[in-house]
């Protein structure tokens, strides 16, 4: 990764009556614009996210999406949909006076990158996508219902289902929704920690015991659940795949971990079949962007796409 430099410009943008989103710029003010779209939904961005881009070459824009990270109010699901986030990205671009930019997103960030590019293809110079997630029911069931990745980590799964009454475990996402939006804050925080611990375990190529902070877990647990319950506000299983024609002209590199248990290879494969113009690069890695094989592959992907952006 590149040196992590401090932002030269940052602030908050009022994007609705309720929400203010945090934004920052680092790197070269006159460089090639790139926006980093974090995962989750609700994960927020970290300073390390700047490190995928050469700060001498890129004007690096990072935002925290509605309800998470440094954005305000925290863990708020009201007025918080995929299409709200797409509109927010455009508001940031317009505020910063950027004509077109490279869009870089992983996991949920890949969903949002594709949704944004398909809505505003004229504003996208290129796409670098990692850990493809299309927000299809089959993908959320794999993650958070019995019979998916639960078969691989049954001991961790037992902890994940523990907050849910046995007679509700046939619809865990719905059952968790009731807990994560409960009026009792202790109920919310306990459920959020169980949800986040499960996911944190899955994203590591070499899993280790995790103990996430309950309050820090609330945004990702609540917002992921909110989006999953609502199908990401996408119309059907092939909502993104059926609109690839809008972005086939955009230079695109897909980086996918072969052993990714959070966003399995099948979604990257489906995207590459629908979008043969994109280059699919499969890495011997899991899901987490900061694992060394994925870091190297992502930095290389950004370097390789650069000539197409100039």
From Swiss-Prot:
<dbReference type="GO" id="GO:0004177">
    <property type="term" value="F:aminopeptidase activity"/>
</dbReference>
<keyword id="KW-0963">Cytoplasm</keyword>
<dbReference type="InterPro" id="IPR029058">
    <property type="entry name" value="AB_hydrolase_fold"/>
</dbReference>
<feature type="active site" description="Proton donor">
    <location>
        <position position="287"/>
    </location>
</feature>
<feature type="active site" description="Nucleophile">
    <location>
        <position position="107"/>
    </location>
</feature>
<comment type="similarity">
    <text>Belongs to the peptidase S33 family.</text>
</comment>
<dbReference type="Pfam" id="PF00561">
    <property type="entry name" value="Abhydrolase_1"/>
</dbReference>
<dbReference type="GO" id="GO:0005737">
    <property type="term" value="C:cytoplasm"/>
</dbReference>
<feature type="domain" description="AB hydrolase-1">
    <location>
        <begin position="33"/>
        <end position="290"/>
    </location>
</feature>
<feature type="active site">
    <location>
        <position position="260"/>
    </location>
</feature>
<dbReference type="GO" id="GO:0006508">
    <property type="term" value="P:proteolysis"/>
</dbReference>
<dbReference type="InterPro" id="IPR002410">
    <property type="entry name" value="Peptidase_S33"/>
</dbReference>
<keyword id="KW-0031">Aminopeptidase</keyword>
<dbReference type="InterPro" id="IPR000073">
    <property type="entry name" value="AB_hydrolase_1"/>
</dbReference>
<dbReference type="InterPro" id="IPR005944">
    <property type="entry name" value="Pro_iminopeptidase"/>
</dbReference>
<keyword id="KW-0645">Protease</keyword>
<keyword id="KW-0378">Hydrolase</keyword>
<protein>
    <recommendedName>
        <fullName>Proline iminopeptidase</fullName>
        <ecNumber>3.4.11.5</ecNumber>
    </recommendedName>
</protein>
<comment type="function">
    <text>Specifically catalyzes the removal of N-terminal proline residues from peptides.</text>
</comment>
